[in-house]
Amino acid sequence: MSDYQVLLYYKYTTIDDPETFAKEHLAACKEMELKGRILVATEGINGTVSGTVEATNKYMDYMANDARFADMVFKIDAADAHAFKKMHVRPRAEIVSLSLEEDVNPLEVTGTYLEPSEFREALLDEDTVILDARNDYEFDIGHFRGAVRPDIQNFRELPGWIEDNREQLADKKIVTYCTGGIRCEKFSGWLKTAGFDDVSQLHGGIATYGKNEETKGELWDGQMYVFDERIAVPINQVNPTIVGKDYFDGTPCERYINCANPYCNKQILASIENEKKYLRSCSHDCRVHPANLYTKNLSKEEFTERLQAIDETLPEMVQ
């Protein structure tokens, strides 16, 4: 049995003073020796925390004693250690940011909830568009079979992508999904206000679908990206597959790294061998960038040799 747990949760509810709440909540979390990342806004709370089984159970009891969060659903993953290095609770304008001119309140408008078994039926329906509401790098390591991959690197870019592709989506039955459900609550609501009539969402997100005894994560390919030290977790208990591809050679890969140029920091899938071969950099410009955190530890001679091995050279100004 694992000694630790990771809790994923959210709740759209009114928090009158997010700054005071965040300060007090941080103190409570630290007292319970939790680590994680929690966002608080007037519209609610969005968090992921890790801790011992005892500590996380205590936290869930603590939240249940607050009427605002009494019915909040926690997605629970077993873990061998903390999934975060520190504990942060931050006040924000939104708990998920779509940066709309007129914000959408999921308590007033949101897509129809589909339970896991209903969502699986939608996956098999040729007349339904399954729309991934996550970022492109999340999709690339794992997604539902046949889902549409929006070309976005941030959630707030999604409405713009929808508008650019409105013709293909018009009059379609749309079902959207995300990690734990929070993004879809707001996004599906926005879709309805934007003129899309038949909009549904996976209730509880991918995390719930993967743990459902009936679906067991079936029709999910790859792993689910998570925003903590684990990076990705398995979902499909029936016939798991690898869909991630190495950025450099296209071979199957589920290992994410960040480009060593801090001004880029792009997330790419790469094997240990290719990380070394390509100096943990996504492009030539990033490899030779003066701020590169990987190459700064190499001598000029070694740097030159490593570049020559991949048919590249140092810029003249550096030579």
Swiss-Prot record:
Annotated SUPFAM superfamilies: Rhodanese/Cell cycle control phosphatase
Catalytic activity: uridine(34) in tRNA + AH2 + O2 = 5-hydroxyuridine(34) in tRNA + A + H2O
All residue ranges annotated as the Rhodanese domain in the record: 124-218
GO molecular function: oxidoreductase activity, acting on paired donors, with incorporation or reduction of molecular oxygen
Active site location: 178
Keyword Cell wall biogenesis/degradation on entry: no
Pfam families documented for this protein: Rhodanese, Rhodanese_C, UPF0176_N
GO process terms (BP): tRNA modification
Known EC number: 1.14.-.-
Keywords assigned: Oxidoreductase, tRNA processing
PROSITE patterns: RHODANESE_3
CDD domains: RHOD_YceA
Domain of life from the UniProt record: Bacteria
Group of enzyme by EC: oxidoreductase
Keyword tRNA processing included in the entry's annotation: yes
UniProt family annotation: Belongs to the TrhO family.
Function summary: Catalyzes oxygen-dependent 5-hydroxyuridine (ho5U) modification at position 34 in tRNAs.
Protein name: tRNA uridine(34) hydroxylase
Name of encoding gene: trhO
